[in-house]
Swiss-Prot record:
It comes from the Eukaryota. It is an enzyme of class 7 (translocase). InterPro entries: NADH_Q_OxRdtase_suD, NADH_UbQ_OxRdtase_49kDa_CS, NDH1_su_D/H, NiFe-Hase_large. This is NAD(P)H-quinone oxidoreductase subunit H, chloroplastic. It is found in: Plastid, Chloroplast thylakoid membrane. It catalyses: a plastoquinone + NADH + (n+1) H(+)(in) = a plastoquinol + NAD(+) + n H(+)(out); a plastoquinone + NADPH + (n+1) H(+)(in) = a plastoquinol + NADP(+) + n H(+)(out). Its EC number is 7.1.1.-. One of its GO terms (cellular component) is chloroplast thylakoid membrane. Its main location: plastid.
Length: 391
């Protein structure tokens, strides 16, 4: 019998590959169909977001942060506002806190929906992609009626939110929740027991609890590996402690476990939204006391000439001379900001801790020894957005 030895082949996937979920490039070394090595190449979408923050006020910087994870922009807005709030010890009214939680959970559902559709398309199932767009469109309609924008909302403000919920919005959102829960069951009936789907995800890309902790993973990646860790429970931020919900987690640590965790999180998010809508208190939607931090306006802005060029000062806040790390549970994991202030309206240092960047580092060990076709399954299960990976 003649045994022929084959040489390894180096293949470049991306950065313009339809399954790369953005401009990501993978340099893959193959031995036939087996993956020997995988090297992610990042930076194609780098825009210097951390440096831009150092010469912008917080309000000026808000439109930039929605370009990190552009599919779940409420989380990036929330962390941008939470950092100076914690540093300056600004209290948020109860109503504003409930509104924030509702918006964050709607954003979590929209993000998980737009993960589920392309993930299924990556492994060969096209139908769910069209189903999820139907429900996601309803969430964007809710965002549009509350904030004026379908994406890039610019809704969060220091000490609260920009505007109160419009008349009839709460009833409209409750109707969506009642409509959406049966749809999650529909997704599961369509996907979970499908034998082709199970063959593609079961036992693929396994990472155990200890490895997940050592790699610094967070979000569904960590919870699918047997770690019951959710910052909404751990850090007690906003009003999550006043609501009844449970952390979704699995022990297997494979692609199927990550799918189950995210589908379960959509259910829990609906439960959180329903409770928050029914318990939302009255009162102000913004802490007007926070305006006391407003720096003095220049007297020349009231001059005669300025009336003709519509010069209007946006509220600027002096960031105290301290340092603080703030984090929250975004749809993809722990989104954090390390903020250093120096008693100026601009941050001295604005360090971003994106969940996608950390979670992506585990891709090479996960795909080593797997088949070429499994790369798309594993990469899809990680759920990355290159806007926040490259920043």
């Amino acid at each position: 019998m003649l045994i022929r030895k084959t040489n390894s082949m180096i293949v470049s996937m991306g950065p313009h590959h339809p399954s790369m979920h953005g401009v990501l490039r993978l340099i893959i070394t193959l031995d036939g169909e087996n993956v020997i090595d995988c090297e992610p190449v990042l930076g194609y979408l780098h825009r210097g977001m951390e440096k831009i923050a150092e010469n912008r006020t917080i309000i000026q910087y808000l439109p930039y942060v929605t370009r990190w994870d552009y599919l779940a922009t409420m989380f990036t807005e929330a962390i941008t506002i939470n950092a100076p709030e914690k540093l300056a010890n600004i209290q948020v009214p109860k109503r504003a806190s409930y509104i924030r939680v509702i918006m964050l959970e709607l954003s979590r559902i929209a993000s998980h929906l737009l993960w589920l559709g392309p993930f299924m398309a990556d492994i060969g199932a096209q139908t769910p992609f069209f189903y999820i767009l139907r429900e996601r469109e309803m969430i964007y309609d809710l965002f549009e009626s509350a904030t004026g924008m379908r994406m890039m909302h610019n809704y969060f403000r220091i000490g609260g939110v920009a505007v109160d919920l419009p008349y009839g919005w709460i009833d409209k959102c409750l109707d969506f929740c009642e409509y959406f829960l049966p749809k999650v069951n529909e997704y599961e009936n369509l996907i979970t027991q499908n034998p082709i789907f199970l063959k593609r995800v079961e036992g693929i890309g396994v990472i155990n609890k200890e490895e997940a902790i050592n790699w610094g993973l967070s979000g569904p990646m960590l919870r699918a590996s047997g770690m019951e860790w959710d910052l909404r429970k751990v850090d007690h931020y906003e009003c999550y402690d006043e609501l009844d919900w449970s952390v979704q987690w699995e022990k297997r640590g494979d692609c199927l476990a990550r799918y189950i965790v995210r589908v379960g999180e959509m259910r829990e998010s609906v439960k959180i939204i329903q409770q928050a809508l029914k318990a939302i208190p009255g009162g102000p939607y913004e802490n007007l006391e926070a305006r006391k931090l407003n720096t003095k306006k220049s007297t020349q802005w009231n001059d005669f000439e300025y009336q003709f060029i519509s010069k209007k000062s946006s509220p600027t806040f002096k960031i105290p001379k301290q340092e603080h790390y703030v984090r929250l549970e975004a749809s993809k994991g722990e989104l954090g900001i390390f903020l250093i202030g120096d008693d100026n309206i601009f941050p001295w240092r604005w360090k971003i801790r994106p969940p996608g960047f950390i979670n992506l580092q585990v891709l090479p060990p996960l795909v080593n020894g797997m088949k070429l076709a499994d790369i798309m399954t594993i990469l899809g299960s990680i759920d990355i957005i290159m806007g926040e990976v490259d920043r």
